Design a protein with these regions (language model features):
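Glycine-centered secondary-structure boundary/capping sites
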Residues: 25-27, 107, 157-160, 170, ...
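Amphipathic alpha-helical segments that form the core helices of the histone-fold
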Residues: 170-178, 189-195
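An accessory alpha-helical subdomain
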Residues: 114, 118-120, 126-165, 173-176, ...
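Catalytic cores of RNA-modifying enzymes
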Residues: 1-136, 182, 191, 195-198
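Glycine-rich, flexible loop segments associated with nucleotide phosphate handling
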Residues: 29-33, 164-169
């Protein structure tokens, strides 16, 4: 690439480097497009690091394990629905562009792959007063996904709400006390986070 004057190779660990500083230095702070074939075992930390650190991004187009790509775009009530689904869908609109079968690689892997594009929202699709609280609620809801939402939140190490506070917040948002977290939409998690935020 040395003959290309519009290419800069940066030898850094993406999980440690200050991406906001790189975008500021090399792209004058304008939104960038991320295109990558990510190491499958660190896909989630990379994506969430870009989103949670509010790196100016217009889109992310990546090849990932097919199972992970599916998790990013599914909705409530499915076995693949979880914290990653909600986080990605809060920040971006996911769409699988292509499935890549194992026979496209040499040596042939044991898992399928997919190219997925995440188009960043200018504004999140839901209004939430405290993002960090919402994501703590989401993680707590799926850490013990077979438990009811009340028990999952009450037993969470990340939260310190009493059972009474949890039931009050759920009543205010119209969420049944016997529901599991895997049944809630992103909008319902946002409403619940806003209700909890008013309690403290």
């Amino acid at each position: 690439l040395k003959d290309w004057d519009n290419v800069t190779v940066i030898n850094e660990d993406i999980l440690k480097v200050d991406m906001n500083q790189l975008v500021k230095e090399y792209n004058q702070g304008r939104p960038i497009k991320v295109v990558a074939n990510l190491p499958y075992y660190i896909t989630t930390p990379i994506i969430m690091g870009l989103f949670e650190n509010h790196v100016p991004i217009s889109s992310i187009t990546i090849m990932v394990q097919k199972e992970v790509a599916d998790r990013m775009q599914v909705g409530p009530g499915t076995k693949d629905y979880g914290a990653l689904s909600l986080a990605v869908q809060y920040y971006a609109r996911p769409q699988i562009i292509a499935n890549v079968p194992p026979n496209c690689f040499m040596p042939r892997p044991k898992v399928g792959s997919a190219v997925i594009q995440l188009v960043r929202y200018e504004e999140p699709p839901v209004q939430v007063d405290n993002e960090k609280l919402m994501f703590r609620l989401i993680r707590a809801s799926f850490n013990q996904r077979r438990k009811t939402l009340v028990n999952g939140l009450k037993n969470s190490q990340e939260l310190d709400f009493s059972k009474e506070e949890i039931e009050k917040a759920m009543a205010e948002t119209g969420i049944p006390v016997n529901v599991r977290g895997e049944a809630l939409t992103l909008a319902e998690f946002a409403d619940l986070a806003n209700a909890f935020n008013k309690l403290r």
